[in-house]
């Protein structure tokens, strides 16, 4: 009888040990997986597990949105489709020139799929027309390129002819 009890007790303790061992292995595996997740999400600092999971979820959502955006861009580029996201039915490039006294401001919006225009070419047009460039900026946002040039007439009495500058700029961008 005692022998049966020992075997019964032995098997019960053996099952308990196996359960404990499996639980320990599971915890070790989860700890390893969380450390991998932490290295991908925030490699600079250690976060508690709940914050780590929240940050990982938001990071995955951002990545999914980025993949969708890039797939859409790829589809448009491969399809040769040039889509205008701005309001109205105006086509890009969009050039606007404003002049006030001896100061002239040029704004140009182009699609990235269009022929590239070098900023120095635009600046040289202003300089050749007798203007001193005060500011020249180039920005790339999403699928658009924005050029802004602000110039001032070198000789205020002579001034600058905005129509001539606009004509020359249109020749460059077309």
Curated annotation (Swiss-Prot):
Annotated ranges, domain bHLH: 14-63
Disulfide partners: none
Source domain of life: Eukaryota
GO cellular component: nucleus
Location of the protein in the cell: Nucleus
GO function terms (MF aspect): DNA binding; DNA-binding transcription factor activity; protein dimerization activity
Signal sequence extent: none
Family the UniProt entry places it in: Belongs to the bHLH protein family.
Protein name, UniProt field: Transcription factor bHLH168
Lineage, top ranks: Eukaryota, Viridiplantae, Streptophyta, Embryophyta, Tracheophyta
Gene that specifies this protein: BHLH168
């Amino acid at each position: 009888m005692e022998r049966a009890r020992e075997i019964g007790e032995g098997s019960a303790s053996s099952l308990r040990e196996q359960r404990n061992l499996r639980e320990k292995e599971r915890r070790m595996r989860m700890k390893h997986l969380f450390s991998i997740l932490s290295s991908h999400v925030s490699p600079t600092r250690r976060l508690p597990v709940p914050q780590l999971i929240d940050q990982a979820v938001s990071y995955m959502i951002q990545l999914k949105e980025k993949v969708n955006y890039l797939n859409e861009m790829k589809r448009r580029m491969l399809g040769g489709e040039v889509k205008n996201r701005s309001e109205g039915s105006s086509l890009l490039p969009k050039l606007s020139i404003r002049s006030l006294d001896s100061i002239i401001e040029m704004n140009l919006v182009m699609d990235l799929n269009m022929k590239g225009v070098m900023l120095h070419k635009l600046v040289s047009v202003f300089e050749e027309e007798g203007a001193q460039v005060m500011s020249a900026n180039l920005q790339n946002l999403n699928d658009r390129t924005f050029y802004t040039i602000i110039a001032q007439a070198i000789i205020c009495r002579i001034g600058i002819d905005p129509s001539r500058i606009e004509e020359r700029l249109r020749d460059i961008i077309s």
